[in-house]
Amino acid sequence: MGKNLLEQLRQFTVVVADTGDIQAIETFTPRDSTTNPSLITAAAQMPQYQEIVDSTLLKAKDEAGENASIKDIVRLAFDRLAVAFGLKILQIIPGRVSTEVDARLSYDTEATIAKARYLIGEYAKAGIDKKRILIKIASTWEGIKAAEVLEQEGIHCNLTLLFGLHQAIACAEAKVTLISPFVGRILDWYKKSTGKEYDSHEDPGVQSVTTIYNYYKRFGYKTEVMGASFRNIGEIIELAGCDLLTISPQLLDQLRNTEGDLPRKLDPATVPQDIEKIVMDKATFDKMHAEDPMASEKLAEGIAGFTKALEVLEHLLEERLKVLDGQEHIKHGAEEIFHAYDLDGDGFITREEWAGTDVVFDALDRDHDGKITAAEMSAGLGAAFRLASVG
């Protein structure tokens, strides 16, 4: 019996689990893992993680003091919750976990640096070496400059929401540890813009990551490339050989259950030599960003989506804290999330409205029709996500 695609992929690419579901991580045994507000929101609705949420909230309330507002408590609890899930994940995986800086700080270099130092400090209190943590930051110019400072302090960074070569070059010149170009979201933009369907080998997201990978290898940059946000296993197959790929449990399951040859597509030995080097400064970055409508739109949309996911999670934590305090709980979390994301009130959440993490959208979209209904949501953040995560 031949090897499945997942086994073959692991021969030349580090596989990272794009999930906050600890049981899914145990199932697929990735080296690294990643979390963010929408993943934590989904996991926090699942009964098996309620104890983590409750204990984190109560501890934050205790430490915030009697005069703290509920919003102050919840903000403290969110950072602690991100670290709590990260600590659980680090008990399972041998490598690193990515923990995200508040997306609302994406255009504030100093605030991003301060938040990153705080998160690393929280992990240090639990005895975790900072080498096992990647601080996830949006790839704005300000975020990249924050990462440059943090890397000089030995705090490793994962620059996310990366859609253009200009962002990738700026990250490499800042000597960041890792970047996460978003394959599927690039494809989404081009499909919507052109009305075309793309085969995997001509997928604009695949081509973007290939260009970035070749540029890095051609000029000897040490920054690792981790392809993210996949729509199908065809994209993953075309990027076999990329340094790392972060893959949802659903697609990991498909790879594990598919046999056939998986040739290496990205390889330092076959990188073209006729690539022009670009010196990146802020003026060049801003010019290239303005000239790339896809990167401009998707970066802004991604920050807005991650911000909304954070606000929804904070609201759910507020509601949960009221329950723990014995106050009346007015609405179920899934209902709250549905109304928060159904921006036009038509009774459906599209991928554009969701704008948060793709893995959660895909898990909730149980019939895979590209939209989430209220019924799917209520089935939802526990049952549907669990079903898709563990398979």
UniProtKB/Swiss-Prot annotation:
It is an enzyme of class 2 (transferase). It catalyses: D-sedoheptulose 7-phosphate + D-glyceraldehyde 3-phosphate = D-erythrose 4-phosphate + beta-D-fructose 6-phosphate. Its EC number is 2.2.1.2. GO terms for cellular component: cytoplasm. One of its GO terms (biological process) is pentose-phosphate shunt. Keywords: Calcium, Cytoplasm, Metal-binding, Pentose shunt, Repeat, Schiff base, Transferase. Ca(2+) 1 binds at residues 342, 344, 346, 353. Ca(2+) 2 binds at residues 365, 367, 369, 371, 376. Residues 329-364, 365-387 form the EF-hand domain. Residues 1-329 are annotated as: Transaldolase. It is found in: Cytoplasm. NCBIfam families: PRK12309.1, talAB. PANTHER family: TRANSALDOLASE. Transaldolase is important for the balance of metabolites in the pentose-phosphate pathway. This is Transaldolase. It comes from Synechocystis sp. (strain ATCC 27184 / PCC 6803 / Kazusa).
